């Protein structure tokens, strides 16, 4: 089988590529260049997609004895990931750029180029499993990345492989060390790769500018002014620019954001509880949409809690009623549906959250 191994320069994608070589496949390594501006991406051992990472990936490819290339996806990355991230925050949403990168770069732009060049599959170092075409959680629950892959279609999954999903991370590092890969002890990256400073608010402010608005309480009384809704997210408690806690002495949290009026509302923690979600552009990873109400589990953050729910396709939107509430859910987040399974929860689909509601939970 002709395999294109996406090599980030980290230990996970390196071992994934090595396993495909061991399996006897015709493997070619590729690293994605995502920025043309030096210093625009995070650099160093904790980086992602930096020049250092490209060099690390090339050295691993040399050890494995496979061809290696660097493909320039900088413009596509800027348009489909960075610009999308900025515009989402400007709309008062809270997006996940890693999900957009998987959806629009790794398994869209890269995927299309790979198939056009005659490759059978794209291999990555994601912690997830594929079983008979079904996407499942990884064995290592702490590293599971099925959430950020839940935007992939059945067709994309047919041409994808995740070779390390059945192995805990410590064993991956041990394997890399045994193979003599210099990245065996390379730290994981945790931050957004295109924000070198790690300061998301400053990054957004430089691109969106000042769009003044007000911070109000539940009754509509103005508590403070602000320079833009991009500086806030649902559930935020610190950095609100307000004098202190509410009249009852309890902390106040961001409970609603209206980008059109520039209004940020704050309230009690109880106001963050939601029992219903609405999502747009649903994707069902098995390829078929449910024909009626679907009992499932829902997750709204990459490593967040799950709660049981009933999901149903209503027109072109996904309607989800939760059995127990989730706290601090924002528009722009991705909701992912799972089917609980002792052998590894199966991903059923996903959608981008457009609305939340505090209506009564499903009984």
From Swiss-Prot:
Subcellular location as annotated: Cytoplasm
Positions with a binding annotation for ATP: 6-13, 32, 125
Gene Ontology, cellular component aspect: cytoplasm
Catalytic activity, as annotated: S-sulfanyl-L-cysteinyl-[protein] + uridine(34) in tRNA + AH2 + ATP = 2-thiouridine(34) in tRNA + L-cysteinyl-[protein] + A + AMP + diphosphate + H(+)
Record key words, sorted: ATP-binding, Cytoplasm, Disulfide bond, Nucleotide-binding, RNA-binding, Transferase, tRNA processing, tRNA-binding
Region feature (Interaction with tRNA): 143-145
GO BP, one annotated term: tRNA wobble position uridine thiolation
Site, Interaction with tRNA: residue positions: 126, 333
InterPro entries: MnmA-like, MnmA-like_C, MnmA-like_central, MnmA-like_central_sf, Rossmann-like_a/b/a_fold
Record-linked CDD domains: MnmA_TRMU-like
Database matches in NCBIfam families: PRK00143.1, trmU
Family, per entry: Belongs to the MnmA/TRMU family.
Protein name: tRNA-specific 2-thiouridylase MnmA
Organism whose genome encodes this protein: Mycobacterium marinum (strain ATCC BAA-535 / M)
High-level lineage: Bacteria, Bacillati, Actinomycetota, Actinomycetes, Mycobacteriales
């Amino acid at each position: 089988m002709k395999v294109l191994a996406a090599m980030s320069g980290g230990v996970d994608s390196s071992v994934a590529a090595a396993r495909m070589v061991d399996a006897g496949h015709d493997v070619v390594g590729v690293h994605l260049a995502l920025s043309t501006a030096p210093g625009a991406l995070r650099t160093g051992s904790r980086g992602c997609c930096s020049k250092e990472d490209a060099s690390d990936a090339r050295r691993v490819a040399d050890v494995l004895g496979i061809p290696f290339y660097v493909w320039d996806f900088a413009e596509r990355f800027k348009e489909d990931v960075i610009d999308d991230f900025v515009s989402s925050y400007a709309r008062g949403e809270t997006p996940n750029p890693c999900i957009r990168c998987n959806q629009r770069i790794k398994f869209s732009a890269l995927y299309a180029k790979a198939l056009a060049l005659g490759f059978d599959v794209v291999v990555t170092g994601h912690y997830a499993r594929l079983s008979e075409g079904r996407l499942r959680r990884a064995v290592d629950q702490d590293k599971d990345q099925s959430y950020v892959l839940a935007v992939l279609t059945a067709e994309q999954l047919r041409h994808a492989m995740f070779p390390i999903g059945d192995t805990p991370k410590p064993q991956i590092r041990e394997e890399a060390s045994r193979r003599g890969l210099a990245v065996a002890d390379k730290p994981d990256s945790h931050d957004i790769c295109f924000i070198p400073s790690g300061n998301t608010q400053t990054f957004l402010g430089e691109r969106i500018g000042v769009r003044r608005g007000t911070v109000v309480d539940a009754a509509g009384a103005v508590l403070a002014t602000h320079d833009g809704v991009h500086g806030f997210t649902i559930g935020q408690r610190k950095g609100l620019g307000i004098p202190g806690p509410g009249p009852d002495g309890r902390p106040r949290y961001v409970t609603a954001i209206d980008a059109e009026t520039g209004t940020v509302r704050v309230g009690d923690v109880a106001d963050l509880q939601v029992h219903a979600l609405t999502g747009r552009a649903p994707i069902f990873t098995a390829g078929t949409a449910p024909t009626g109400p679907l009992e499932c589990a829902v997750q709204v953050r990459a490593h967040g809690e799950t709660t049981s729910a009933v999901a149903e396709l209503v027109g072109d939107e996904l309607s989800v009623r939760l059995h127990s509430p989730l706290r601090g859910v924002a528009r722009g987040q991705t909701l992912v549906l799972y089917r609980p399974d002792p052998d590894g929860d199966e991903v059923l689909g996903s959608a981008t959250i457009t609305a939340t509601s505090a209506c009564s939970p499903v009984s």
